[in-house]
Amino acid sequence: MHADIAHVIERPADLTAEWLTAAIGAGPVADFSVERIGTGQMSECYRIRLDYADGAAGPDRPESVVLKVAATDPVSRQTGLALGLYEREVRFYGDIAPRLGGPIAPCYHAAVDTSTGAFDLLLGDAGPAVVGDEIAGATAEQAHLCVVQLGRLHGPLLGDTALAEAPWLNRDSPLNQAMIAPLYAGFVDRYGDQIAPEHRVVCERLVASFDGFLAQEAAPDRIQGLMHGDYRLDNLLFGTAGADRPLTVVDWQTVSWGPALTDLSYFLGCALPTQDRREHYDALLRAYHQALGPSAPLSLADVAEGVRRQSFFGVMMAIVSSMLVERTERGDRMFMTMLQRHCDHVLDTDALATLPAAQTPEPLRPSEADELAHAPTAEPLWSESWYADFADAAQGLGGWFRLGLIANERTAWVHALLCGPDMPTLAADVRVPLPADPWVLGTDSFELGHAATAPLQTYRLDLRARAQAYSDPSALLRGEAGTPVEMTMNLVWDTDGVPYKYRMTTRYEIPCRVSGTVTVGDVDYRVESVPGQRDHSWGVRDWWSMDWIWSALHLDDGTHLHGVNIRIPGAPAFSIGYAQGADGGVTELQTVDSRESFGVNGLPLNATLVLEPVDIDVCGHAPVRLTAADGRVSQFPRAWAAITTADGRRGVGWVEWNRNLPAETE
């Protein structure tokens, strides 16, 4: 295998006969043809048929090879890069596969650029072969072949100390209890009438104790090993007459180091219909154990107990995978089949008895170090932003500010807007070169200084800008110019609640009281301890790949409500948020929904948030329009509003919608 990092094949068009000749090393390739195969979302596969200059293909000359490259879709590529999927698969074929043999395709070339996500794998073609069918299930003979080959893969690496320390193989899982709970809520909302009562018990017990389950299975006394991570029939190719191998395992992007019996349990839980599994279960466990080899550090009883404990992995995969991939009719049938069979596996082995007690995760809090600026990674859409708002109902004035640093585009965005029911909307919307100092920047038209003067307690903003005034704020969504006017914000945000850190991404929110001065032309406002919010966010942010509704609301009784409902095309919506009482107690929210209507100008007319629920009466509009480098456009209608809860409590706050438009060139 060649690992030429300097020469990554990004697309099939990059292939040449000379390159294929060198990579395969089986003689001069005179010509080749390319055929797309498979429908993967994170990567793309192509069959490359080869014509040799000095003779036909033979035993040492493959007739065809398979090229695997990163997805062309930028969102999919960023996801694959951020999760380490591309690096894992390349490193597996380069570092681990040569030690194993067995059901693994030969690799002729493997390379990855971890700064861009470009990668390639040139693999032996598994054909002629038949892919397994998760819904129909395997025959007993196929299941026996699969567990034997899996045992031969696992055996040489059980307890390997070097692999246990390899950073690329031991990335922390992003999944935890706070993440799986809202995914399960969406799962029940979609499939609830198809879930048997006894299977719902399994799911609810797992979700309620998920963090404890993960900690329990990562304990030092649990033997660790190589995990394919998705060892199921859809990733197994059964060789037919003329194939080089009886079985080929594909899609190693989820390879990791973890509980050794996970793959076996996942396979046994669903590869056979429930009654067939029960009939052949013990024989399949024995076949796997024997395939581990005579020096395996596991007894047959150890294998059975490990499979029992890991039977929940399949339940988790049925819930999570169904909520994160594009919905299809076959997908629905497959996920319901998975859930039924894996839950039966849990019940048949009495695995519920191994779960720890249910627990509610404590809300996360940011550290003082989180208030600092962060070093960017190489992802093109990595950004860091600081946001702060206020709403002064007595004076009819609301405002917000955001500084966004898009490091790898060498650009900074500054937004500062003021609005109210009896005033035009004022907007400073500026793009400038990335500053050397993230805390101070300016041009002839604005000066900005900001700082967390007391980390997690006090944040200060000093802004002077030549803004634009709009009697019709929807003009901002159309990119139109307004009337020039000077404005300033000299404000301090003092923390008025518990700082809240997201679990799913690097971001935190802080409810505040805001004081200071604002000027609009010759008009001065004195802001005295009014409700507000601030947040700080850093990481890969593609605002043009999803829609959302965000809110930060503050009630007169001291309650703070925050929620965001994110809507990604092809996936169910999911939510993050909290309710904080005046006593400092924080309750995390799993469901945040909204009902809103928009005018033809793109501004919200009215809305209801379903987190209390809350009715919203818009007091001022302060929208922005964001255009990506590739022409994609997002409209951000933003409004501050008076709010009323169902039980009559009142307050104020800000609401934001992100609404993506078709790409355009500006």
For the regions a language model picked out, list residue spans one by one.
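Active-site acidic catalytic loop and adjacent metal/ATP-binding pocket
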Residues: 39-55, 66, 210-260
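Conserved ATP-binding subdomain of kinase catalytic cores across diverse folds
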Residues: 44-46, 51-52, 57-178, 261
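ATP/Mg2+ or Mg2+-diphosphate-binding catalytic cores
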Residues: 309-359
